[in-house]
Protein backbone atom coordinates (compact mmCIF):
# COMPACT_ATOMS: atom_id res chain seq x y z
CA UNK A 1 0.00 0.00 0.00
CA UNK A 2 1.25 3.48 -0.84
CA UNK A 3 -0.35 6.50 0.79
CA UNK A 4 0.13 10.06 -0.35
CA UNK A 5 -1.15 13.34 1.15
CA UNK A 6 -3.22 16.07 -0.45
CA UNK A 7 -1.67 16.96 -3.77
CA UNK A 8 -2.98 20.45 -4.49
CA UNK A 9 -1.25 23.54 -3.08
CA UNK A 10 -4.62 25.29 -2.64
CA UNK A 11 -5.83 22.67 -0.18
CA UNK A 12 -5.36 22.60 3.55
CA UNK A 13 -6.26 19.97 6.10
CA UNK A 14 -8.01 22.84 7.86
CA UNK A 15 -10.30 25.14 5.91
CA UNK A 16 -10.15 27.62 8.79
CA UNK A 17 -6.68 29.19 8.78
CA UNK A 18 -7.07 30.23 12.43
CA UNK A 19 -7.48 26.57 13.43
CA UNK A 20 -4.54 25.63 11.22
CA UNK A 21 -2.34 28.18 12.93
CA UNK A 22 -3.51 27.07 16.38
CA UNK A 23 -2.70 23.47 15.45
CA UNK A 24 0.82 24.33 14.31
CA UNK A 25 1.45 26.53 17.35
CA UNK A 26 0.68 23.59 19.59
CA UNK A 27 2.62 21.15 17.44
CA UNK A 28 5.56 23.46 16.84
CA UNK A 29 6.10 24.64 20.39
CA UNK A 30 4.64 28.14 20.20
CA UNK A 31 5.55 29.38 16.72
CA UNK A 32 4.80 33.04 16.00
CA UNK A 33 2.61 34.22 13.12
CA UNK A 34 5.72 35.43 11.30
CA UNK A 35 7.36 32.02 11.65
CA UNK A 36 4.19 30.32 10.45
CA UNK A 37 4.02 32.65 7.43
CA UNK A 38 7.54 31.56 6.45
CA UNK A 39 6.75 27.88 7.07
CA UNK A 40 3.54 27.92 5.01
CA UNK A 41 5.12 29.88 2.16
CA UNK A 42 8.03 27.44 1.94
CA UNK A 43 5.81 24.35 2.05
CA UNK A 44 3.37 25.68 -0.53
CA UNK A 45 6.28 26.58 -2.81
CA UNK A 46 7.66 23.04 -2.52
CA UNK A 47 4.22 21.61 -3.17
CA UNK A 48 3.67 23.80 -6.21
CA UNK A 49 7.03 22.81 -7.67
CA UNK A 50 7.08 19.09 -6.93
CA UNK A 51 3.66 17.71 -5.98
CA UNK A 52 2.07 17.13 -9.38
CA UNK A 53 5.12 15.55 -11.02
CA UNK A 54 5.89 13.35 -8.02
CA UNK A 55 2.28 12.26 -7.67
CA UNK A 56 2.01 11.29 -11.33
CA UNK A 57 5.22 9.25 -11.07
CA UNK A 58 4.06 7.49 -7.90
CA UNK A 59 0.64 6.68 -9.33
CA UNK A 60 2.19 5.30 -12.52
CA UNK A 61 4.57 3.06 -10.56
CA UNK A 62 1.79 1.87 -8.27
CA UNK A 63 -0.40 0.93 -11.21
CA UNK A 64 2.50 -0.77 -12.99
CA UNK A 65 3.36 -2.94 -9.99
CA UNK A 66 -0.24 -3.32 -8.81
CA UNK A 67 0.34 -1.58 -5.50
CA UNK A 68 -2.89 -0.31 -3.89
CA UNK A 69 -3.06 3.44 -3.37
CA UNK A 70 -4.48 5.46 -0.49
CA UNK A 71 -5.30 9.16 -0.48
CA UNK A 72 -4.87 11.18 2.71
CA UNK A 73 -6.80 14.05 4.34
CA UNK A 74 -9.18 14.54 1.40
CA UNK A 75 -11.07 17.78 1.99
CA UNK A 76 -12.76 18.98 -1.21
CA UNK A 77 -14.70 17.65 -4.18
CA UNK A 78 -11.52 18.25 -6.19
CA UNK A 79 -9.66 15.82 -3.92
CA UNK A 80 -12.38 13.23 -4.52
CA UNK A 81 -12.01 13.61 -8.29
CA UNK A 82 -8.24 13.12 -7.93
CA UNK A 83 -8.78 9.99 -5.83
CA UNK A 84 -11.17 8.50 -8.38
CA UNK A 85 -8.90 9.33 -11.32
CA UNK A 86 -5.90 7.82 -9.52
CA UNK A 87 -7.90 4.63 -8.81
CA UNK A 88 -7.39 4.96 -5.08
CA UNK A 89 -8.49 1.95 -3.01
CA UNK A 90 -8.59 3.60 0.41
CA UNK A 91 -9.19 7.17 1.58
CA UNK A 92 -7.39 7.85 4.86
CA UNK A 93 -8.88 10.38 7.27
CA UNK A 94 -11.13 12.53 5.06
CA UNK A 95 -11.46 15.83 6.89
CA UNK A 96 -14.95 16.88 5.76
CA UNK A 97 -18.32 15.16 5.37
CA UNK A 98 -18.44 16.60 1.85
CA UNK A 99 -15.33 14.69 0.83
CA UNK A 100 -16.37 11.55 2.71
CA UNK A 101 -19.72 11.40 0.93
CA UNK A 102 -18.05 11.80 -2.45
CA UNK A 103 -15.50 9.09 -1.71
CA UNK A 104 -18.16 6.73 -0.40
CA UNK A 105 -20.34 7.31 -3.47
CA UNK A 106 -17.32 6.43 -5.64
CA UNK A 107 -16.91 3.09 -3.87
CA UNK A 108 -13.64 4.01 -2.15
CA UNK A 109 -13.15 2.49 1.31
CA UNK A 110 -12.99 5.16 4.01
CA UNK A 111 -10.41 4.72 6.75
CA UNK A 112 -10.38 6.55 10.06
CA UNK A 113 -8.19 6.29 13.14
CA UNK A 114 -9.29 4.02 15.96
CA UNK A 115 -8.16 6.66 18.51
CA UNK A 116 -10.79 8.94 16.96
CA UNK A 117 -13.45 6.46 18.14
CA UNK A 118 -11.88 5.85 21.56
CA UNK A 119 -11.40 9.53 22.45
CA UNK A 120 -14.73 10.60 20.92
CA UNK A 121 -13.39 12.71 18.09
CA UNK A 122 -10.41 13.85 16.04
CA UNK A 123 -7.36 15.11 17.95
CA UNK A 124 -6.94 17.80 15.28
CA UNK A 125 -10.56 18.96 15.25
CA UNK A 126 -11.68 17.28 12.04
CA UNK A 127 -14.75 15.06 11.59
CA UNK A 128 -15.48 12.27 14.06
CA UNK A 129 -15.27 8.64 12.97
CA UNK A 130 -18.57 7.93 14.73
CA UNK A 131 -20.32 10.57 12.60
CA UNK A 132 -19.13 8.74 9.48
CA UNK A 133 -20.22 5.41 10.95
CA UNK A 134 -23.69 6.79 11.63
CA UNK A 135 -23.99 7.56 7.92
CA UNK A 136 -22.68 4.13 6.91
CA UNK A 137 -19.41 5.56 5.61
CA UNK A 138 -16.82 4.01 7.94
CA UNK A 139 -15.15 0.97 6.38
CA UNK A 140 -11.73 0.62 8.04
CA UNK A 141 -10.14 1.58 11.35
CA UNK A 142 -6.38 2.01 11.64
CA UNK A 143 -4.30 2.08 14.81
CA UNK A 144 -2.93 5.52 13.82
CA UNK A 145 -0.82 6.65 16.79
CA UNK A 146 -2.14 4.13 19.40
CA UNK A 147 -1.79 0.45 18.37
CA UNK A 148 -3.89 -0.78 21.30
CA UNK A 149 -6.82 1.37 20.14
CA UNK A 150 -7.80 -1.09 17.39
CA UNK A 151 -9.46 -3.57 19.72
CA UNK A 152 -10.82 -0.84 21.97
CA UNK A 153 -12.50 0.91 19.06
CA UNK A 154 -13.93 -2.32 17.63
CA UNK A 155 -15.59 -3.00 20.99
CA UNK A 156 -16.82 0.56 21.45
CA UNK A 157 -18.19 1.16 17.96
CA UNK A 158 -21.46 -0.81 18.46
CA UNK A 159 -22.20 1.26 21.57
CA UNK A 160 -21.89 4.49 19.63
CA UNK A 161 -23.66 3.25 16.50
CA UNK A 162 -26.54 0.82 17.20
CA UNK A 163 -26.76 -0.14 13.50
CA UNK A 164 -23.27 -1.68 13.74
CA UNK A 165 -23.05 -5.06 15.47
CA UNK A 166 -19.86 -6.48 16.98
CA UNK A 167 -19.07 -8.67 13.96
CA UNK A 168 -19.33 -5.67 11.63
CA UNK A 169 -17.15 -3.60 13.94
CA UNK A 170 -14.48 -6.30 14.05
CA UNK A 171 -14.45 -6.42 10.25
CA UNK A 172 -13.23 -2.80 10.21
CA UNK A 173 -9.94 -4.01 11.72
CA UNK A 174 -9.70 -7.41 10.01
CA UNK A 175 -11.42 -8.47 6.79
CA UNK A 176 -12.12 -5.10 5.18
CA UNK A 177 -8.57 -3.69 5.42
CA UNK A 178 -7.14 -7.01 4.23
CA UNK A 179 -9.41 -6.98 1.17
CA UNK A 180 -8.67 -3.32 0.46
CA UNK A 181 -4.96 -4.03 0.00
CA UNK A 182 -5.39 -7.35 -1.79
CA UNK A 183 -4.46 -9.71 1.07
CA UNK A 184 -6.96 -12.43 0.27
CA UNK A 185 -5.31 -15.04 2.51
CA UNK A 186 -6.25 -13.39 5.82
CA UNK A 187 -8.74 -11.18 7.60
CA UNK A 188 -11.40 -13.74 8.55
CA UNK A 189 -11.86 -17.14 10.14
CA UNK A 190 -12.55 -19.33 7.11
CA UNK A 191 -11.32 -22.46 5.36
CA UNK A 192 -8.17 -21.72 3.38
CA UNK A 193 -7.23 -18.58 5.31
CA UNK A 194 -4.06 -18.14 7.40
CA UNK A 195 -5.71 -18.75 10.77
CA UNK A 196 -4.28 -15.64 12.41
CA UNK A 197 -6.32 -15.46 15.61
CA UNK A 198 -6.43 -13.76 18.98
CA UNK A 199 -8.34 -14.70 22.12
CA UNK A 200 -9.56 -11.63 23.97
CA UNK A 201 -10.92 -11.14 27.47
CA UNK A 202 -12.89 -7.98 28.21
CA UNK A 203 -12.21 -6.59 31.68
CA UNK A 204 -13.94 -3.38 32.76
CA UNK A 205 -14.77 -2.61 29.14
CA UNK A 206 -11.12 -2.95 28.10
CA UNK A 207 -9.91 -5.75 25.79
CA UNK A 208 -7.05 -7.88 27.08
CA UNK A 209 -5.33 -10.21 24.60
CA UNK A 210 -4.92 -13.64 26.22
CA UNK A 211 -3.62 -15.75 23.33
CA UNK A 212 -2.27 -15.25 19.81
CA UNK A 213 -2.11 -17.70 16.89
CA UNK A 214 -0.18 -17.04 13.69
CA UNK A 215 -0.93 -19.27 10.72
CA UNK A 216 -2.60 -21.72 13.08
CA UNK A 217 0.31 -21.94 15.53
CA UNK A 218 0.11 -20.39 18.95
CA UNK A 219 2.85 -17.79 19.40
CA UNK A 220 1.72 -16.01 22.57
Q: What are the language-model segments listed below?
A:
Residues 1, 71, 91, 142-143:
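Small/polar loops that bind or transfer phosphate-bearing groups
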Residues 12-110, 122-137:
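Histidine/acidic residue-rich metal-binding segments in metalloenzymes
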Residues 106-116, 120-200:
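His/Asp/Glu-enriched, well-ordered alpha-helical/loop segment
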Residues 205-207:
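Short, small/polar residue-rich loop motifs at catalytic or cofactor-binding pockets
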Residues 212:
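Short aromatic-centered micro-motifs
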